[in-house]
Amino acid sequence: MKTESKNLVRWGILSTANIATKVARAINLAENAELVAIASRTEERATAWAQKHNVPIAYGNYDVLLSDSSLDAIYIPLPPSMHAEWTISAAERGKHVLCEKPLAADSDEATMMADACRQNGVQLMDGVMWVHHERTAMMKQKLGDLGELRRVTAAFTFSWNTIPTDNIRAKPELAGGSLGDLGYYCVRAILWAFEEMPTKVFATARYKVGVDFNLAGILWFDDDRIATMDCGFDTSLRKWFEVAGTKASLVCDDFTVPTSEESARFWIHGSENEKHETGACIQEVNMIERFSAIVQSKNLEPEWADVAVNTMRVCDALLESDQRGEIVNL
């Protein structure tokens, strides 16, 4: 049940991109949020989207939406190349920002975004939904049962039979590519498990239409720990990770998006194989409720921006390694 309307965090969405529909549903289901406005590049498109999704206000201009003083928080699902411009613009107008992943086109832009939000006293978070699922907290608790953590392996792929020319993932000028779209999740899973940055990385990628079509990477950490990851648009759907320790390993085969909203699973493989399950959970609703709670409390959580910037730093290093053909130190 929604809280009193006067206490709800008022959201605006900057773009009618496909993912905006999913997040709009999450805002509508969240107990502490309401979707007030949508903006698109044309008033006609914004109005049509608003009517379809029962949004009260439609703007045919992104800048006008950001000038709406009634809005508390902005969700930005624009192409990655546009994230920095509009996040900084939102922050300068006192809006809290939930920005779709990857956080930016590169780590320099990501740092600028984080700095702008901090200087203007607003929250910044990237749109990585899986970290907000109840299963993720349960898995985190179980990592201690694995012994000393030694390895993390993560993969996220899907297959394009024909490259869609109108998809932002395939447009280098919009900062497309498999690493930002898919590998970003893998890097986040590795940082989530090891809770620190790698010391060096190596990667190799294959390019099509000017973007990394697939990429495989190795990440080295202190104490002889290693992580590997791969992502790409050329393999059937895979969205799994494994965390291996000296006593047991944890495996999740659908970590980015659980197969069902009714339950989510993972396994512990050791002397006995254990299957663990959670109850019903919609991770994007949890994300919106968490973000809105931060806005309501006025107690900002800078660690969300920090981990997003660090994810971008690792992604940049992986791309640099591929381009140089050698190990890159962080």
Residue ranges and their predicted role:
Residues 276-289:
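Active-site loop of classical SDR/Rossmann-like NAD(P)-dependent oxidoreductases
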Residues 1, 188-258, 287-299:
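Contiguous beta-strand/loop segments that form the cofactor/metal-binding neighborhood of enzyme cores
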Residues 1-53, 292:
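N-terminal Rossmann-like dinucleotide-binding module
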Residues 130-202, 207, 325:
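Predominantly a Rossmann-like dinucleotide-binding segment in NAD(P)-dependent oxidoreductases
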Residues 111-129, 148-152:
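Rossmann-fold dehydrogenase core element
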Residues 23, 53-116:
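Beta-loop-alpha module in the N-terminal Rossmann-like domain of NAD(P)-dependent dehydrogenases
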